[in-house]
Curated annotation (Swiss-Prot):
Homodimer. The keyword Acetylation does not apply. The keyword ATP-binding does not apply. Residues 400-457 form the HTH myb-type domain. The gene is trf1. One of its GO terms (biological process) is telomere maintenance via telomere lengthening. InterPro entries: Homeodomain-like_sf (IPR009057), Myb_dom (IPR017930), SANT/Myb (IPR001005), Telomere_rpt-bd_fac_dimer_dom (IPR013867), Telomeric_DNA-bd_trans-reg (IPR052833). This is Telomeric DNA-binding factor trf1. SMART domains: SANT (SM00717). Residues 428-453 bind DNA. GO terms for molecular function: double-stranded telomeric DNA binding; protein homodimerization activity. Gene3D superfamilies: Homeodomain-like. Disruption phenotype: Cells arrest in interphase and have an aberrant chromatin structure.
């Protein structure tokens, strides 16, 4: 058997030839480096190398493709195919930091929403009086929020898709953060101009191409009005240019592009309403005289009140933090209740809504023992408080559910109670006008009819009576009492 001549360059060149295009000029430097290494290895003394010996590389090169092109590291970070076939993409340090700070971003956003979700006078006093106890606490929270937010983006708002926040919990957190940014800017705690607020409104309040609700459209129009008043006060641009920027003639086209619809598709009912109202508002602003009196017709305080009303109606769903199914199961077993995993995931806001509602609107967790104390408290908060207090006294027995009956979600219960408060009693058709199909405020109750509203309201009233608590004024006119039931 003849001896094999030792020529390391053949092995290196052979392996290199498997993965590298010989005509590639970008790898010329790598070839030269390997050639020098081959020449150095060829100078090894023959007596130090055993016959038939292979080069002791220390690892197996077979099946491994070399890729030292400039896009190698980019491919690694983007999770594409790259050398060594790693099973998972390698995240950048910045991405790891953003992921680890998601809980912090969510907690700070919840605190800001809870403070700015208070009545307008109370929230304004906190923001404008940094020397007060609450003002100092809010200032510290805002400072921490700015530092954490800058880790995610230097823009005014956080775009989750642009920074790789793709999981449901991450997107939910960035949505709450954007809402906190918007409200802080409205109250003057963050320096963001009306232009950016107007441009990002739909992304903040109706993200991920979701349908715009009627109350969101009202806020959208009022924001444009306040932006116009502010721009006219600065007197830097002609009135017509400002109106055309805020109320463009191609709003219908923009709505379709926003939700990736075809240009020949029809607008939704709410989108048509928004365009009609914005067109009328634009004409009124253009013909209004004197312009200085606009502040009296469209006061800033009214806009703040509408923002606060939106928070009141949507805070629990916006700031609900997803809870793992296993932790929900453990808590359910402790209370003697049994749920399926799908049920636990479908209503994550129920677990922490009592705490967040109390935090947002300053409602104490003590028992309400008199009707005078409940006059200024919404039925939603009262219902949550009583349910929270009675959860610890529930028996292990649970009524068997009817298979074909659709259980009420927390959002539906809140909409029903809010509707009872707004229409001042059991006016079921009016409640459906607010929350039913094409509702003026939302479509939470679009799958409910008047009979279902009546039955649910009756059960809610009985719930208060059986708990020994004062029935809210909105439920007092609902049929049902303990003597008959």
């Amino acid at each position: 058997m003849s001896k094999r001549s030792l020529d390391p360059s053949d092995d290196f060149k052979g392996q290199k030839r498997l993965a590298i295009d010989p005509e590639s000029t970008a790898l010329e430097q790598d070839r030269q480096m390997l050639q020098q290494l081959s020449e150095q290895n060829s100078e090894l003394e023959p007596q130090n190398v055993a016959p038939n010996a292979e080069i002791p590389l220390g690892f197996d090169l077979s099946g491994i493709q070399f890729n030292m092109t400039p896009d190698f590291y980019l491919r690694m970070n983007q999770g594409m195919d790259y050398a060594f076939n790693q099973p998972n993409p390698i995240a950048t340090p910045q991405q790891l930091l953003r992921t680890s700070l998601i809980p912090t971003l969510g907690n700070l956003s919840n605190i800001i929403l809870s403070i700015l979700g208070k009545p307008v006078q109370e929230a304004s006093a906190i923001v404008t009086n940094p020397a007060s106890e609450m003002g100092m606490a809010f200032t510290k929270v805002m400072n921490m929020f700015r530092m954490v937010k800058d880790i995610y983006t230097e823009e005014s708002f956080i775009y989750s898709s642009a920074i790789g926040m793709r999981t449901p919990s991450q997107r939910s957190t960035t949505r709450r953060a954007n809402l906190a940014i918007f409200l802080a800017a409205v109250y003057g705690a963050l320096q963001i101009g009306f232009f950016h607020l107007n441009e990002n409104f739909l992304e903040v309040f109706a993200p991920d191409e979701s349908n715009i609700l009627t109350n969101q459209g009202t806020l959208y129009m009022e924001l444009k009005t306040q932006a116009y008043i502010s721009a006219m006060a600065q007197a830097e641009r002609p009135k017509g240019d400002i109106l055309n920027d805020l109320f463009p003639s191609d709003m219908a086209h923009r709505f379709l592009i926003r939700r990736n619809a075809k240009l020949d598709d029809k607008l939704t009912y709410v989108e048509k309403q928004i365009i009609e109202k914005c067109t009328a508002r634009k004409e009124r602003l253009a013909n209004f005289s004197p312009q200085e009196a606009l502040n009296e017709v469209y006061p800033w305080g009214k806009f703040l009140s509408e923002i606060a009303c939106y928070i009141h109606n949507n805070y629990s769903s916006i700031s609900a933090i997803p809870i793992p199914a296993n932790s929900f199961k453990r808590r359910s077993k402790k209370n003697g209740l049994r749920f399926k995993a799908g049920e636990a995931e479908s209503s994550p806001s129920e677990s922490g809504s009592d705490l967040t509602d109390s935090l947002a609107f300053g409602i104490p967790s003590s028992t309400f023992d008199g009707s005078s104390e409940t006059q200024n408290v919404s039925s939603v908060v009262l219902y949550d408080q009583v349910r929270h207090m009675t959860n610890n006294n529930l028996n292990n027995k649970r009524t068997r559910r009817v298979a074909n009956r659709r259980s009420w979600t927390k959002e539906e219960e809140e909409a029903l109670l809010d509707g009872l408060d707004l229409v001042k009693g059991p006016r079921w058709s009016q409640i459906l006008e607010l929350y039913g199909p094409g509702g003026k405020k939302s479509e939470v109750l679009k799958y409910r009819n008047q009979v279902q509203l009546k039955d649910k309201a009756r059960n809610m009233k009985l719930f208060f009576l059986k708990s020994g608590q004062v029935v809210p004024a909105a439920l007092q006119c609902v049929t049902g009492d303990l003597r008959r039931d």
